[in-house]
Amino acid sequence: MVLRSEILTKKSELPTPDQALPGRESAMPVPEAHFVNGRPLTAPFPAGLQQVLFGMGCFWGAERRLWQQPGVWVTAVGYAGGYTPNPTYDEVCSGLTGHSEVVLVVYNPQETSFEQLLKVFWEAHDPTQGMRQGGDIGTQYRSVIYTFDAAQKAAAMASRENFQAELAKAGYDRITTEIADVPPFYYAEAYHQQYLAKNPNGYCGLGGTGVCLPA
């Protein structure tokens, strides 16, 4: 049996459900409005909008990159893909929840395409690094795409193959990005929401490979 203390020293290994922290029933309180555009952070969202969860390292820089994209209606940061319900940031950073730091992207498909958002996703980080992103090491920094329907999932998987071909030409390893149906999403604490808009000189570890995804 692997103990929780051993997981803490192995930042590259996900916990099992039995090892994960128990969490709590109550959800994290979040601001009503996006700090940048004033739109609601939580559902229900206007009819016709679509959603996706992207994880590409520390969610501060990832969220800023995504809210800046044309056609993105609102963004929020949180945790997904693990076992612990309603985790805190410290719990996620412990490696004992199984969650990844993710950005909820709500977008208008009449103003941008899912394929365009995938291009931003692949080019904005290094998806070959496994349980880390640059100097940020831990399972919470793994690369993930959590999709809301079959069409999104198929498009994400096709784009992964296309980007893998381009990365191979540049000498990069295999993509480690997880692509899966959307799991429960838990909003992060209020101070994490739109963090780099509130703290313009704050830490941003986002960095791509320089490889482009062909149109």
From Swiss-Prot:
Enzyme Commission number(s): 1.8.4.11
Gene Ontology cellular-component terms listed: cytoplasm
Organism superkingdom: Bacteria
Molecular functions (GO terms): L-methionine-(S)-S-oxide reductase activity; peptide-methionine (S)-S-oxide reductase activity
Pfam families registered for this protein in UniProt: PMSR
Annotated catalysed reactions: L-methionyl-[protein] + [thioredoxin]-disulfide + H2O = L-methionyl-(S)-S-oxide-[protein] + [thioredoxin]-dithiol; [thioredoxin]-disulfide + L-methionine + H2O = L-methionine (S)-S-oxide + [thioredoxin]-dithiol
Protein name: Peptide methionine sulfoxide reductase MsrA
One GO term (biological process): cellular response to oxidative stress
Record organism: Pseudomonas aeruginosa (strain UCBPP-PA14)
Enzyme class, spelled out: oxidoreductase
Function, as annotated: Has an important function as a repair enzyme for proteins that have been inactivated by oxidation. Catalyzes the reversible oxidation-reduction of methionine sulfoxide in proteins to methionine.
Record-stated family: Belongs to the MsrA Met sulfoxide reductase family.
Name of the gene: msrA
Keywords: Oxidoreductase
Active-site residues, record numbering mapped to chain: C58
Lineage per the UniProt record: Bacteria, Pseudomonadati, Pseudomonadota, Gammaproteobacteria, Pseudomonadales
